[in-house]
Amino acid sequence: MAPYGDLIRNKTGLMLSPFFPAAKMAWLLSNTEGAKERDPEDLCLGTIDSWLIYRMTRGKAFKTDYSNASRTQLFNIHTLSWDEELYELFGVSAKSLAQVCDSNSLFGMTDLDGYFDHEIPIHSAAGDSHAALFGQGCHSAGMIKTTYGTGSSIMMNTGMECVSSRHGLVTSLAWGLDGQVNYVLEGNINYTGAVMTWLKDELHLISSPAESEAFAKAANPVDKTVLIPAFSGLSAPYWSDTAKAVIYGMTRTTGKNEIVRAALESIALQIQAVLEAMEKDSSICIKELRVDGGPTRNSYLMQLQSDLSKLDVAVAGIEELSAMGAAYMAGIGAGILNQSELFSEEGRTLYSPQMTEEERKEKIGNWNESIRLVCGATVQ
């Protein structure tokens, strides 16, 4: 499949990877007894949203939305349709794929197997990060959000322009609303919150991730220790499968506080690298970073993110922004909400840059030098 990597990337915006559903579908068809002999119209191959819609409607609807379809590696994000060359390449029939709809379409009706006394409309379907982008109010080109979790998703709305990445990001569809699609650039990072779990479970340096803030604030400001959390290689924007995790630059006085701080800094520095790649790819000057997820409760991390990016970082007042975004889309689809009136700044916490430019450049420079040492990545 490797020789088709460029073809797949050009049509789908995604790098060839078994992470995406196309490879999984091909495997299922080859390894499920009788699957290849069945009429393709008797098979349903799709993402989790299409399965849920199928079950909730008792098999009456097999549908998906643009955001989920665009992550299958079978969907052409330029023609906005299943791509014959791609699904034949993976041995999948178009007859087995879900109908692609706007994210705020009427997907079907359900009573949730009798939970409701009457059927209600299913008016929304969207990918997790895509829904969070919408829930954050990032509805226009140039707006950007980061969801912090075990890993992190950084996503920029590029509006109706499909921007091809030259700096290690993927291009995808944000959503389709009322007949109009928006595109995104996205960078996914494997180890962010998971670094704190590693400190707790394997090194026993902290008893909970919440403790990391106090340790980081108590660290020696002169210490330059850098932690590269490449436990399974490095993802966006570096994409190195061979990189290994390292703690670099320790001295005799480096202790627990300094290592914990380096781990926290690795989260912010990885995200900063993706933000820089997004500005280069899009030629858009980012104005603000909207953030959500559990680690955003760490004020040290949020202030550092603001300092490194030289951006105001706005922490959402609502944790479940993916659910909120999907609910907003459903409300628009049902005609009870107006998109222009959705987003509110109420409850947000705002962090503004405070770090000197000299200190900022030194931290980013030390990080980039460490990246070069572990994977030979070209870093500006």
Describe the role of every protein-language-model region.
Residues K95-Q99, C285-E288:
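Short acidic capping loops at alpha-helix termini that bridge into adjacent secondary structure
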Residues M1-F62, Q73-L89, T110-D292, T296-Q380:
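Active-site core segments that coordinate phosphate-bearing ligands/cofactors
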